[in-house]
């Protein structure tokens, strides 16, 4: 991945029951369960190849997903991605842990810019006492009603990443859960 400047690689493997099957590999070569942003790109690529209908059905290591592509004029549009259900949320002193396809630690902070994402993130990511499989680490700042900023240390990439779709999902769930906003849509600002 470093030769082309990417953080991951996705491979399509055909499936008899579904439109396609996605396998995700991190920059360090390890297999990942899911990548939300990668899945959106994968669905758009499948559309480009003429695979499936307007709604794509595909599996990833974490389970079966759907991707519904809605086109606006030209290349613009929206991809609505069906993620796995979150079955459990664990919490500690100012942090939460959940799985949105991959494991995510979420910590609410007052100033996301003041966080040493690589230093703190690495320490939490490798805290096998709390997270035996390791975890992605998200630092989240609420900037308004329905608006948050997020920075993520990504497992497998092993440094801060510019954007993380499963992390954004985790951040929205935890912001709503922890603050009981009742908001179902969030605008999430990430570095990328």
Name each model-derived stretch.
Residues 36, 101, 140, 165:
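Residue-level signal for inorganic ion chemistry
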Residues 27-99, 169, 173-192:
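Acidic, low-complexity central loop/insert segments
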Residues 12-13, 67-69, 140:
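A structural signal for short hydrophobic beta-strand segments in well-ordered beta-sheet cores
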Residues 110-157:
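A mid-sequence, solvent-exposed acidic-amphipathic segment
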Residues 30-33, 153-162:
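Short pre-catalytic strand/loop immediately N-terminal to key active-site residues, enriched for Gly-Thr
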Residues 93-115:
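Internal active-site segments that recognize and position negatively charged phosphoryl groups
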Residues 1-5, 9-10:
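Single conserved hydrophobic/aromatic residue that forms the stacking wall/gate
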């Amino acid at each position: 991945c470093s030769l082309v400047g990417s953080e991951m690689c996705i491979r399509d493997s055909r499936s008899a029951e579904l439109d396609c099957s996605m396998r995700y590999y991190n920059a360090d070569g390890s297999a990942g369960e899911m990548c939300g942003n990668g899945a959106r790109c994968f669905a758009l690529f499948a559309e480009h190849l003429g695979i499936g209908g307007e709604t794509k059905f595909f599996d990833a290591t974490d389970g079966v997903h759907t991707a519904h592509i809605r086109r606006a004029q030209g290349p613009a549009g929206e991809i609505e991605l069906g993620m796995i259900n979150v079955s459990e949320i664990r919490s500690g002193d100012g942090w939460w842990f959940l799985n949105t396809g991959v494991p995510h630690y979420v910590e609410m902070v007052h100033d996301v810019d003041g966080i040493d994402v690589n230093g703190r993130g690495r320490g939490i990511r490798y805290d096998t006492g709390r997270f035996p499989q390791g975890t992605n680490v998200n630092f989240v700042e609420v900037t308004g009603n329905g608006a948050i900023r997020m920075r993520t240390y990504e497992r497998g990439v092993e440094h801060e990443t510019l954007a993380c779709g499963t992390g954004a999902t985790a951040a929205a769930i935890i912001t709503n859960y922890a603050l009981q906003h009742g908001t179902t849509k969030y605008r999430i600002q990430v570095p990328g």
